[in-house]
């Protein structure tokens, strides 16, 4: 089975993050200084929030990532008990190697209950010297205000059409796919509304099935 293009071309360092310059500029300073605040990355799906979070971790922790970085899908582990046990244990135990702190990525945080979020606020405060949190969500309004105020908040914008055209064209070139015209790609990008991840997935589906991009769009809309 061929590798998913979204995984194959997922950026792993901050230099590969596109369209989110405010976050990248600040994150590069955090890497240099080996320090960072708690962070909330919010915005529509497919704009690179999780990839940006992991890229920050890779650049900041480097070889010390193992044993100091933990990723939790907060939509799946959304209960109060998750915070009281799993997250608290990670945040409170000793960091390894030369890492300045542990980093916990809470992905899809807008699925976590309000009680669990309030418990997380207390963990965040108590273990501030030992742990940082990176939170991603689509809807920031589902994050309680006390958590928002304890983090630097970054809006992840929809990927601009011109930038998306460059990225998708580059992927097609690397995959040796030459059958799409620029006008086809431009129509396809208009349909995506800035969701780069969906664009890469749909492009791979179209190229592997020999469907035209127009047919791929129509099929997806059914």
Would you name each region that the model predicts?
Residues 175-179:
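Short, polar/flexible loop-turn hinges at active-site or ligand-entry regions and domain interfaces
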Residues 1-163, 169, 173, 183-190, ...:
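P-loop/Walker A NTP-binding region and its immediately flanking N-terminal helices
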């Amino acid at each position: 089975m061929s590798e998913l293009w979204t995984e194959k071309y997922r950026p792993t360092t901050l230099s590969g993050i596109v369209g989110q310059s405010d976050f990248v500029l600040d994150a590069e300073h955090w890497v240099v200084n080996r320090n960072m605040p708690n962070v909330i990355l919010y915005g529509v799906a497919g704009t690179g929030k999780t990839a940006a979070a992991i890229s920050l971790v890779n650049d900041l922790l480097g070889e010390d990532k193992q044993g100091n970085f933990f990723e939790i899908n907060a939509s799946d582990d959304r209960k109060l008990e998750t915070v009281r046990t799993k997250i608290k244990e990670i945040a409170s135990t000793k960091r390894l190697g030369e890492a300045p702190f542990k980093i916990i990525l809470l992905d899809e945080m807008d699925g976590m209950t309000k009680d669990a979020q309030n418990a997380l606020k207390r963990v965040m405060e108590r273990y501030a010297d030992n742990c940082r949190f990176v939170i991603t969500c689509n809807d920031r309004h589902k994050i309680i205000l006390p958590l928002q105020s304890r983090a630097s908040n970054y809006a992840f914008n929809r990927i601009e059409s011109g930038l998306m055209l460059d990225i998708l064209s580059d992927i097609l070139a690397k995959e040796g796919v030459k059958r799409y015209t620029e006008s086809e790609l431009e129509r396809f990008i208009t349909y995506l509304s800035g969701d780069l991840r969906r664009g890469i997935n749909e492009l791979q589906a179209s190229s592997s099935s020999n469907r035209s991009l127009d047919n791929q769009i129509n099929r997806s809309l059914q």
